[in-house]
Amino acid sequence: MDMATSNINGHGDRPSPAARFPTAPSVMTMNGNFASVGDAPTKEQYEHGIQVIDEQKEFNPNLNEYLQYTDTAHSGFNYHLISVFGSQSTGKSTLLNHLFGTQFGVMSERERRQTTKGIWMSKNKNQSSGASESETMADNILVMDVEGTDGRERGEDQDFERKSALFALATSEVLIVNIWEHQVGLYQGANMGLLKTVFEVNCQLFLKDKQSTPRSLLFFVIRDHLGTTPLANLKETLIQDLSAIWTSLSKPAGLENSKIEDYFDFAFAALPHKILQPDKFITEVQKLGTRFRAGRKSARAEDAGFEGGVFLPEYHRRIPADGFAVYTEGVWDQIVNNKDLDLPTQQELLAQFRCDEISREVLISFDAKIHPLEEKQGEDVRSGKPTVIADLGVTGKTARTSTIKHFETQASRYHKAVYTLKRTELEGKIDTRLKLLFHGQLLAAHKSGVASFSDAVSTAVKNGQKRAASYEFADIVEREKEVALKTFEAEMKSLYIEELSWTNFSSSYDLFEKDLNEVSGNLRKEEMRRLATHVERWVRSRLNDSIGVEFNKLGSGRGGSGAPETGEKPATEKDLWDRIWKTFTGTVKEAESKFIERAKSFDASEDEIEIGLWRLRRKSWGVLRAKIDEEVMEGNILLKLRENFEDKFRYDEAGVPRIWRPSDDIEGIYTKARESTLTLIPLLAKFKLLETSSPPELPEWIGNTPASVDPKDEEDLTPIGGVDEEEGKSLEEEMTVLSEAKRQDLVVRFKKTADGVYVEAKRSAIGGVAQVPLYFYGLLLALGWNEIVAVLRNPIYFVFLILCGVAGYVTYTLNLWGPIIRMLNAASTQGVEIGKEKLREFLKDSEVGRQALGMQGRDAGDSDAISLNTLDSRGKRVVREDEDVDEI
């Protein structure tokens, strides 16, 4: 024993633990410094590593947290996974600790028992094994230390051995097989049983996934190589044994003739004895570490099949690092429950899980940008005042692009079909919300645009009216319409997303333009109505003057004694209705020309102009008919008939006033004047033209109802007889000015008025017969001579007499005697009335008066004011409707 010991290092002592493995603890610790399954892990534990699966086959749920801590989770595909196999207590953990700087627990020199239970993982800590890039290890190498086989603790139970092998093969790129040189050529010692298990589970995987055919690298690390047997010979022996095992396997259908090289690549490395040659062992381990980097296949023998490193792209399982924990947990769940492991399905499930998770994450940022806009839009809609949100299109497009970009960056590394499906779903969710938001924005832009257009046109029209200047309505509409369309188009373009067909809002633009046309049409109709009202007012003003003048001409043709024997009326009376019709049609025609000229400036259609003219003619006829009815009202027509009669009775044919004498034929003149005036009543009773002796062609003049007329345009129109047949009123009735009853009543009243004039004339003729006798003047001179002389001698009386004479002459010259007499009569009558009123008040207020008349005193609250009464032309008191007449 002492000799053996002295041969170990040449000095008779074993190397110190630090020399054997500088990072491992001096005694077996069972990876106590790692984060085990069921523990509440700490950062210090994560510094060493994590137990992925414990000896009870429980998966560690904190694996993803460990990957986050080691900055591996966000590396995408830029990571590599290595698993180590080998018999128990053969130095697997020691190899990994030296090769990757890990701190897996190793076996104590004092004991020979199991140290690695379950599957452990640690990240490579020897990132730079050499100075140059070709000697630098790959980034993010994860190392799994798998529980050793042939352990006495498990005995014949090979269930965990098989499950762990299947797990490692499903997840790892490189499987390191740790064997001793003297075990090469053996079955159990060379781990051929374990490799057979690996091959069998590999066939199970390929049976489910024949299309992708993932490859793995079996990296044989031959320990304690003395050099007596060349590495090439050892390699050949191992490949022969592996091929024999592969041939003996029962392969799935379709794989009977497959070769082991179809599914596995092989790499070999030899390490010197760790204890006998510690320095050389460290050197070779460092050289071995440089092979763990990215590389590619090589046909040159000196490259050992690899150019560069051993991490070939086809070895990678293409599971993104952020989904590795979920994927491996799913794989282990399938394995531990003895289900057929379907890696493609697991990859799809992982992709679904991660894509959903990523989708939820990216939607959070999307929601942060979009939700406030949705809230504001919803509040505006609920308040009934939708508003256009500034920069909504830019915000929506930016949020959509960034959200999908982030999803693509993280999720595109997963199963392509699942990624494509989930991206479509994400786009659907985003686009659904954006669609509602964009449509709401366009609706608000639509409503606000229409309202702004209407307000702008109305404001421009009002400004034009205030300036009393002519304005072109069509130009205003066209200008404001162009502004509204440009604003809406700009908003529409801001919402356009090239790859989304539904953001092509051309139909919304067409609808907006259609609504603008409809609104402009309504505004034009309003302007046309305003124009029609203005023209109708102008027609009414003109007709009121001109028709009034025509009616005032009644009786202007002198009749009387100079009238023809036949009693025919002068031309000015016979053609009254012709003149009225001519004046009326001329006025309306002028109004029509003004209407057409102005309507064309509104860009009104032919139909609108036709309807406007039709309404104008009907309205104008209504104005004329109302004016005629006003002129032939009882008071007005009776006054005109009296004026006509007096004009013919009081004046001769030359227009000279008559001075009635007893010798004049008053009765004859009266009869002719009365009969001449009475003939006006039938003339005024019917609206008939002199030329045709029939009413004017009113229906033809008004015209037929336009086909495009709106029922609303007829609501304010008065029915016209002979035109509106459904009203049941004929043209004859429409042209009747005075009914038969009214005519008869008018004749009776006129005759009474004429009789009064005749009596007055008769009295004036008789009154002129009485004369003062001549002797009366002589008697007056004789008896009043003294007074005459006194007046003439007295300057005051004389001047007063002269002034009275001048005043009397002026009064006579100006014909003021009548008004003066009426004023005196009115004043005297008013004085009498006031006297009566004061007498009543005295009798009411006086105690003596009340006793005499048996009246009660009136209330103290009555007014003591004396009011002046309203008198008529004859000095009589006029009683107002709101005034009660006190009875004495």
Swiss-Prot record:
<keyword id="KW-0378">Hydrolase</keyword>
<dbReference type="Pfam" id="PF20428">
    <property type="entry name" value="Sey1_3HB"/>
</dbReference>
<dbReference type="InterPro" id="IPR030386">
    <property type="entry name" value="G_GB1_RHD3_dom"/>
</dbReference>
<feature type="topological domain" description="Cytoplasmic">
    <location>
        <begin position="1"/>
        <end position="771"/>
    </location>
</feature>
<dbReference type="GO" id="GO:0005525">
    <property type="term" value="F:GTP binding"/>
</dbReference>
<feature type="topological domain" description="Cytoplasmic">
    <location>
        <begin position="817"/>
        <end position="888"/>
    </location>
</feature>
<comment type="similarity">
    <text>Belongs to the TRAFAC class dynamin-like GTPase superfamily. GB1/RHD3 GTPase family. RHD3 subfamily.</text>
</comment>
<protein>
    <recommendedName>
        <fullName>Protein sey1</fullName>
        <ecNumber>3.6.5.-</ecNumber>
    </recommendedName>
</protein>
<feature type="region of interest" description="Disordered">
    <location>
        <begin position="1"/>
        <end position="24"/>
    </location>
</feature>
<dbReference type="InterPro" id="IPR008803">
    <property type="entry name" value="RHD3/Sey1"/>
</dbReference>
<keyword id="KW-0256">Endoplasmic reticulum</keyword>
<feature type="transmembrane region" description="Helical">
    <location>
        <begin position="796"/>
        <end position="816"/>
    </location>
</feature>
<feature type="transmembrane region" description="Helical">
    <location>
        <begin position="772"/>
        <end position="792"/>
    </location>
</feature>
<keyword id="KW-0547">Nucleotide-binding</keyword>
<feature type="region of interest" description="Disordered">
    <location>
        <begin position="703"/>
        <end position="723"/>
    </location>
</feature>
<feature type="compositionally biased region" description="Acidic residues">
    <location>
        <begin position="712"/>
        <end position="723"/>
    </location>
</feature>
<dbReference type="GO" id="GO:0005783">
    <property type="term" value="C:endoplasmic reticulum"/>
</dbReference>
<feature type="topological domain" description="Lumenal">
    <location>
        <begin position="793"/>
        <end position="795"/>
    </location>
</feature>
<feature type="domain" description="GB1/RHD3-type G">
    <location>
        <begin position="76"/>
        <end position="315"/>
    </location>
</feature>
<keyword id="KW-0812">Transmembrane</keyword>
<keyword id="KW-1133">Transmembrane helix</keyword>
<dbReference type="GO" id="GO:0016320">
    <property type="term" value="P:endoplasmic reticulum membrane fusion"/>
</dbReference>
<keyword id="KW-0472">Membrane</keyword>
<dbReference type="GO" id="GO:0003924">
    <property type="term" value="F:GTPase activity"/>
</dbReference>
<feature type="binding site">
    <location>
        <begin position="86"/>
        <end position="93"/>
    </location>
    <ligand>
        <name>GTP</name>
    </ligand>
</feature>
<dbReference type="GO" id="GO:0005789">
    <property type="term" value="C:endoplasmic reticulum membrane"/>
</dbReference>
<keyword id="KW-0175">Coiled coil</keyword>
<dbReference type="InterPro" id="IPR046758">
    <property type="entry name" value="Sey1/RHD3-like_3HB"/>
</dbReference>
<feature type="coiled-coil region">
    <location>
        <begin position="724"/>
        <end position="745"/>
    </location>
</feature>
<keyword id="KW-0342">GTP-binding</keyword>
<dbReference type="InterPro" id="IPR027417">
    <property type="entry name" value="P-loop_NTPase"/>
</dbReference>
<comment type="function">
    <text>Cooperates with the reticulon proteins and tubule-shaping DP1 family proteins to generate and maintain the structure of the tubular endoplasmic reticulum network. Has GTPase activity, which is required for its function in ER organization.</text>
</comment>
<dbReference type="Pfam" id="PF05879">
    <property type="entry name" value="RHD3_GTPase"/>
</dbReference>
